[in-house]
Amino acid sequence: VWYEADDIAGTLAKIGEEEGMEVTLVTGDRDYLQLASDKTTVLITRKGITQLEKYDKNRIIEEYGITPEQFIDLKGLMGDQSDNIPGVPGIGEKTGIKLLKEFGTIENLYENIDNVSGKKTKESLIEHKSTAFLSKKLGEIIVNVPLDCSLDDLKVEEPDWERLEEIYTKLEFNSLLSKIPEDKLSNKGSTNYLYF
């Protein structure tokens, strides 16, 4: 079984929630909106990383009219070119959201396919049923990846400044070397290095 970085992030977010933490995910990937909940907030980067847009469960419902969990179904319907997920031809965000507001999930949509209005939409859904389900599966972030570490193992600790100084010096990473706090340098305050 293969997992993506999204799956690791989703699993860690879920573990954090289960341990009573408030979780914040910072990403440029809108796929993460499916992870928003009462305890998980998603910050979407804008214009590089200079602006962040905050999404929690309530904002997603207000803005899109669907729940975070339904974003998986939306991706199944409309696909995602950036992730090579095909979706159903002719179904974009607007139509996908409309269908999910009416039917809730892809599964319920197909159970009630005769109630779908719009001849072209219904025909495309029928013709591309397997693609819709495959796209949903591909778009879902897995939140139960078996991890061999705990959240405590992932805590950020004080760097090994001496080792970093050694590596940066050897590789001549002068700009990184200059960022080591002076009181952590082996030469205590001397950032003047000569390289030949």
Can you describe what each PLM-predicted range is?
Residues 160-196:
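Long, highly charged low-complexity segments
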Residues 1-147:
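Extended two-metal-dependent nuclease catalytic cores across DNA- and RNA-processing enzymes
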Residues 152-159:
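Cytoplasmic/organellar membrane-interface segments at the starts of transmembrane helices
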